[in-house]
Amino acid sequence: ETRYEKFLRQHVDYPKSSAPDSRTYCNQMMQRRGMTSPVCKFTNTFVHASAASITTVCGSGGTPASGDLRDSNASFALTTCRLQGGSQTPNCPYNADASTQRIRIACVGGLPVHYDKSI
């Protein structure tokens, strides 16, 4: 798995997978995308946009932040999943927070390889 492929697996869900509610969405997606074993990932953000539109942030769709980091010019639909306090694997229960914000990502070779934060 390349760094770009890992970025896609962990952070891109487009079109957004259906779930009865946002908490169920996070619980299902975190498991489905392999982020609950061997340990539960504490927090993770899914971007509901195509890989191509996110990749534009690495070029004309973004502005340099620091190092390899770039800030998106446009806002994206996001779902941020946060592990509920004191939870242990394998039952990683997540809280969910939906928002529309700009994103800060790291790019290498013109491809996104790391999600830094929403801004």
Curated annotation (Swiss-Prot):
<dbReference type="InterPro" id="IPR036816">
    <property type="entry name" value="RNaseA-like_dom_sf"/>
</dbReference>
<feature type="disulfide bond">
    <location>
        <begin position="58"/>
        <end position="107"/>
    </location>
</feature>
<keyword id="KW-0456">Lyase</keyword>
<feature type="active site" description="Proton acceptor">
    <location>
        <position position="11"/>
    </location>
</feature>
<feature type="disulfide bond">
    <location>
        <begin position="40"/>
        <end position="92"/>
    </location>
</feature>
<feature type="disulfide bond">
    <location>
        <begin position="26"/>
        <end position="81"/>
    </location>
</feature>
<feature type="binding site">
    <location>
        <position position="9"/>
    </location>
    <ligand>
        <name>substrate</name>
    </ligand>
</feature>
<feature type="binding site">
    <location>
        <position position="6"/>
    </location>
    <ligand>
        <name>substrate</name>
    </ligand>
</feature>
<dbReference type="GO" id="GO:0016829">
    <property type="term" value="F:lyase activity"/>
</dbReference>
<protein>
    <recommendedName>
        <fullName>Ribonuclease</fullName>
        <ecNumber>4.6.1.18</ecNumber>
    </recommendedName>
</protein>
<dbReference type="GO" id="GO:0050830">
    <property type="term" value="P:defense response to Gram-positive bacterium"/>
</dbReference>
<comment type="subunit">
    <text>Monomer. Interacts with and forms tight 1:1 complexes with RNH1. Dimerization of two such complexes may occur. Interaction with RNH1 inhibits this protein.</text>
</comment>
<dbReference type="InterPro" id="IPR023411">
    <property type="entry name" value="RNaseA_AS"/>
</dbReference>
<feature type="binding site">
    <location>
        <position position="82"/>
    </location>
    <ligand>
        <name>substrate</name>
    </ligand>
</feature>
<dbReference type="GO" id="GO:0004522">
    <property type="term" value="F:ribonuclease A activity"/>
</dbReference>
<comment type="function">
    <text>Endonuclease that catalyzes the cleavage of RNA on the 3' side of pyrimidine nucleotides. Acts on single-stranded and double-stranded RNA.</text>
</comment>
<dbReference type="Pfam" id="PF00074">
    <property type="entry name" value="RnaseA"/>
</dbReference>
<keyword id="KW-1015">Disulfide bond</keyword>
<dbReference type="InterPro" id="IPR023412">
    <property type="entry name" value="RNaseA_domain"/>
</dbReference>
<keyword id="KW-0964">Secreted</keyword>
<dbReference type="GO" id="GO:0003676">
    <property type="term" value="F:nucleic acid binding"/>
</dbReference>
<feature type="binding site">
    <location>
        <begin position="41"/>
        <end position="45"/>
    </location>
    <ligand>
        <name>substrate</name>
    </ligand>
</feature>
<keyword id="KW-0540">Nuclease</keyword>
<dbReference type="InterPro" id="IPR001427">
    <property type="entry name" value="RNaseA"/>
</dbReference>
<keyword id="KW-0378">Hydrolase</keyword>
<comment type="similarity">
    <text>Belongs to the pancreatic ribonuclease family.</text>
</comment>
<feature type="active site" description="Proton donor">
    <location>
        <position position="114"/>
    </location>
</feature>
<keyword id="KW-0255">Endonuclease</keyword>
<dbReference type="GO" id="GO:0005576">
    <property type="term" value="C:extracellular region"/>
</dbReference>
